[in-house]
């Protein structure tokens, strides 16, 4: 199901057909360094992750992470979405893109669309985001989206790693 489209992108729900793409994305060096190993090491693992995480989130929350495809040819380039994350008071916006599609404005474009969708369709007025402390690029994108660094936090399920918490306090620039 298509969620929305922007000038260059189409966001749709993750499905089994996206397993190969997901397997590639979650095993890229930047994903492993800044997000962590999600134990997705085969097509079967990717299929299970899509079903047990993404599809389950759509059913339980009414939102989740979505595949970001190029409008011109349907090629998946990344993901963007919303998460009701344990340990955060507000809904979390997140994104990740294949290395060859970074620094092309797709993160910004998909996230602006996601913020608009969250507000207009879901009634979510404020979002937050978390990043690895060393993930400078994501921090800059979040600031461009109208979020600002608030503090370092630890999520309940992760007792060793700290995250930067960004809080929405404005509109995208």
Where are the regions that the model predicts?
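Conserved GNAT-fold acetyl-CoA-binding loop/helix
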Residues: 32-52
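Short, well-ordered amphipathic alpha-helices
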Residues: 51-54, 115
């Amino acid at each position: 199901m298509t969620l929305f489209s922007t000038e260059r992108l189409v966001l749709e729900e993750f499905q089994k057909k996206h397993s190969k793409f997901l397997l590639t994305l979650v095993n890229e060096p930047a994903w492993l360094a800044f997000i962590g190993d999600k134990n997705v090491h085969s097509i079967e693992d990717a299929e299970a992750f899509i079903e047990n995480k993404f599809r389950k989130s759509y059913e339980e929350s009414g939102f989740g992470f979505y595949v970001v495809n190029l409008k011109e040819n349907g090629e998946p380039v990344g993901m963007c979405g919303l998460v009701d994350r344990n340990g955060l008071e507000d809904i979390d916006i997140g994104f990740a893109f294949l290395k060859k599609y970074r620094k092309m404005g797709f993160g910004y474009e998909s996230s602006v669309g996601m913020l608009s969708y969250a507000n207009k369709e879901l009634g979510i007025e404020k979002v937050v985001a978390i990043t690895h402390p060393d993930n400078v690029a994501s921090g800059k994108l979040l600031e461009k989206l109208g979020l600002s660094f608030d503090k370092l936090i630890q999520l309940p399920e992760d007792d060793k790693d700290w995250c930067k918490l960004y809080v929405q306090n404005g509109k995208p620039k």
